[in-house]
């Protein structure tokens, strides 16, 4: 049986649960449930604090976990390996200071830095050869400067709205670029059970990023048309009742769909359709 950790709350929780449901897994029915067993797929899900997930996986108590890259780096150091990036929950981890003050990384030396990610900050300071006092807080880090607890902060930045509300501005290099990821124990062999779950979720991600393009095309323009729609390996080309025309089908990036349809139309293709892909299994 596979044992998988899922965030029980926070920005990653709802999307992670939704992706697993789309991948065919039975999730908890009550938000208060701490575990859920999917008998059909022989997977038990554990709903845990996002910050604790990498710790459980690193120690071998759970096989896989969904968490943030920043959380994994802070809580488990080198104890877990990133197996799959999930493409949601994007953020950066930055130093920030009052926006009316001039700050750079050279000014951090000897200062007080408030953060909920002490290991991540300490590792960054050590890499830069900077000595500073790292103060661990469990939340509301942005208010610590106003309260006199810290000189600067290091925190997750998504939109920057919370920082601006507190009169703060990020500075210096990005410490960590984060998103939701699936982690496994460091150097743990990836078993067939692992692969099934990873491929299912990967299929959901591909379905969100791609769609299927269908169109009719004169044979004389086929070479040019298929340059626009090469597909994954090659497009599917089928004969039509009119021997001078063929039907073409190919996967294409969702973000390029409208421009691609415009170019196919200008080339001379007809009956151009774009349809969603619900789930996919790709070899590459």
UniProtKB/Swiss-Prot annotation:
Cofactor(s), names only, from the UniProt record: Mg(2+)
Keywords recorded for this protein, A-Z: Amino-acid biosynthesis, ATP-binding, Cytoplasm, Glycosyltransferase, Histidine biosynthesis, Magnesium, Metal-binding, Nucleotide-binding, Transferase
Enzyme class: transferase
Protein activity control: Feedback inhibited by histidine.
Protein EC: 2.4.2.17
The keyword ATP-binding is assigned to this record: yes
Disulfide links within the chain: none
Record's catalysed reaction(s): 1-(5-phospho-beta-D-ribosyl)-ATP + diphosphate = 5-phospho-alpha-D-ribose 1-diphosphate + ATP
GO biological process terms, semicolon-separated: L-histidine biosynthetic process
Any one Gene Ontology molecular-function term assigned to this protein's record: ATP binding
A Pfam family hit: HisG_C
Subcellular location: Cytoplasm
A GO-annotated cellular component: cytoplasm
Pathway: Amino-acid biosynthesis; L-histidine biosynthesis; L-histidine from 5-phospho-alpha-D-ribose 1-diphosphate: step 1/9
Family note: Belongs to the ATP phosphoribosyltransferase family. Long subfamily.
PANTHER family: ATP PHOSPHORIBOSYLTRANSFERASE (PTHR21403:SF8), ATP PHOSPHORIBOSYLTRANSFERASE ATP-PRTASE (PTHR21403)
Function in brief: Catalyzes the condensation of ATP and 5-phosphoribose 1-diphosphate to form N'-(5'-phosphoribosyl)-ATP (PR-ATP). Has a crucial role in the pathway because the rate of histidine biosynthesis seems to be controlled primarily by regulation of HisG enzymatic activity.
UniProt-recorded name of the protein: ATP phosphoribosyltransferase
């Amino acid at each position: 049986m596979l044992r998988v950790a899922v965030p029980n709350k926070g920005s990653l929780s709802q999307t992670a649960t939704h992706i697993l449901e789309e991948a065919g897994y039975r999730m908890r029915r009550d938000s208060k449930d701490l575990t859920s067993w999917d008998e059909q797929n022989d997977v038990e899900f554990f709903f845990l604090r996002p910050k604790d997930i990498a710790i459980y996986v690193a120690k071998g108590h759970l096989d896989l976990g969904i968490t943030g890259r920043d959380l994994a780096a802070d809580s488990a150091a080198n104890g877990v390996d990133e197996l799959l990036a999930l493409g949601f929950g994007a953020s950066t981890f930055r130093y920030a200071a009052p926006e009316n003050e001039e700050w750079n990384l050279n000014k951090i030396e000897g200062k007080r830095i408030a953060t909920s990610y002490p290991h991540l900050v300490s590792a960054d300071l050590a890499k830069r050869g900077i000595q500073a006092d790292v103060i661990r807080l469990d939340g509301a880090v942005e208010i610590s400067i106003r309260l006199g607890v810290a000189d600067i902060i290091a925190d997750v930045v998504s939109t920057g709205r919370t920082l601006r509300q507190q009169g703060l501005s990020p500075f210096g290099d990005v410490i960590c670029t984060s998103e939701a990821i699936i982690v496994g124990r460091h150097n743990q062999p990836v078993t067939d059970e692992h692969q099934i779950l990873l491929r299912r979720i990967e299929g959901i991600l591909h379905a969100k990023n791609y769609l299927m393009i269908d169109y009719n095309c004169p044979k004389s323009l086929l070479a040019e048309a298929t340059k626009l729609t090469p597909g994954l390996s090659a497009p599917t080309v089928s004969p039509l009742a009119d021997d001078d025309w063929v039907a073409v089908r190919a996967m294409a990036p969702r973000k390029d769909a409208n421009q691609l349809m415009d170019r196919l139309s200008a080339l001379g293709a007809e009956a151009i359709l774009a349809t969603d892909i619900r789930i996919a299994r790709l070899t590459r």
